[in-house]
Amino acid sequence: MKTLPEDFRTYTQALMGEKLYQRLEHAILEEEAPTSIRINPFKCKDADGEPIPWCPETGRYLSTRPGFTFDPLLHAGLYYVQEASSMFVDMAIRQYVKEPVMMLDLCAAPGGKSTAVRAALPEGSLLFSNEPMRTRSQILAENVQKFGHPDMIVTNNYPRDYKKSKLQFDVILTDVPCSGEGMFRKDEGAIGEWSTQNVNNCWQLQREIVSDIWNCLKPGGILIYSTCTFNAHEDEENVEWICEELGAEVMALEGVEDAWNITRNLTGTDFPVYRFIPGVSRGEGLFMAILKKEGEWEAGSPAKENRKDKKKKDKKVAKGKGPEIPDGWLKADTEWMPAESNETVYAIPGRWKDIYDQAEKNLKVLHAGVKLGTDKGKGLIPDQALALSTMLNKDHFPQVELSYDDAIRYLRKEAVNLPADTPKGYVLVTYRQVPIGWEKNIGNRANNLYPQEWKIKSSHVTGELFIVNS
């Protein structure tokens, strides 16, 4: 049975008041968390379920929790399983970002907020998704590749590395590491890890993170500060510190309805903040504040701001002088520039090539644009990320539609037999007409090219699911 730390109970009850705290404690100890998903609008038309009021275009509450692992469309990136409170960032982006920007999600793993942000940003924006921890950065890269949008760059760096890079952003999301009080309901381990010392360590680390990244935010730019914890040390007190020490103004969101039961400032100060409390609002614990940096923001396309001499760019991609993008692999409505790193070939949207070059020079880039494949000297082997990209020209490749059972076998990286008349070479395999990966047909058998590290490890199967409409 769950028990909450006494120091947590005493402090949080004093902060929230008896009535609010009792609702929180009952939810943590007795209630099930609601199940919710967010659809990928670049791949998916709609989904069953009840719209989430602060993210109505893409967020859905589900009445039950299905076995998501066994839905091939989850692995194809048509939707993402995300708790509802975290989708509040969608409302912040849509309200404060009205034209193309360059944005950084600084602490982005596993990728839920990054993909939510990318869906909400205006077309023509570029999003950097960063994760400082190496193992978590791999999960971030996987989820970004499944999402499939080309205007994203994934990095594995600390804030100080970004400071040195000289890259400048219009918007920065800092979903900072925290004491995790908002996760107590769904993760009992978070309860065991909690301590007052950890809270103290966290609020100090959070200030260091924001301070390190502050110079990367343009004058007049927007900083979205969020945690998944309740205490004021990591929440209101840090927001107040950012305003006083770094020079920022806290901004309010319009249209936040009383019926959503979002709790406001608990410290008696008058600046607007947004706190989701389990048992009160319909989601897990989240705190968010929107801050504007002092100064005048200059509007303009981030691509134009970072463009260099076009002749230099053309010279870089001359035929026979580096990697090339195979004809027909990508949709032709975008200008693509090739890039290569450790035998991996990428297609970078031309408007971002100079920014990509700056990032590649100064940061550890894990993914950018469209990851086409690896070149081992015998031609390009198409990558899983290409199969899942929204820029894939799928009609260029031979395709085989898989049954549900075969799709699950494929995602387990088991052998899947192809029809006898399937052409030799690389074959795009689909499920419900949605690409899920590649096989290499060599005649008497086919090699499953699904990434080993992505495969479904469970042998259990729940049966075919119909959660979203492709």
Can you describe what each PLM-predicted range is?
Residues E99-A109:
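Conserved class I S-adenosyl-L-methionine
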Residues P110-E123:
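Conserved SAM-binding loop of SAM-dependent methyltransferases across substrates and taxa
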Residues N130-L167, T174:
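S-adenosyl-L-methionine
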Residues M1-K45, S63, E294-S470:
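Polybasic, low-complexity RNA-engagement segments
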Residues T135, D170-D212, C228-E236:
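Mobile active-site "lid"/loop adjacent to the S-adenosyl-L-methionine
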Residues P56-Q95, L140, P451:
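Class I SAM-dependent transferase core
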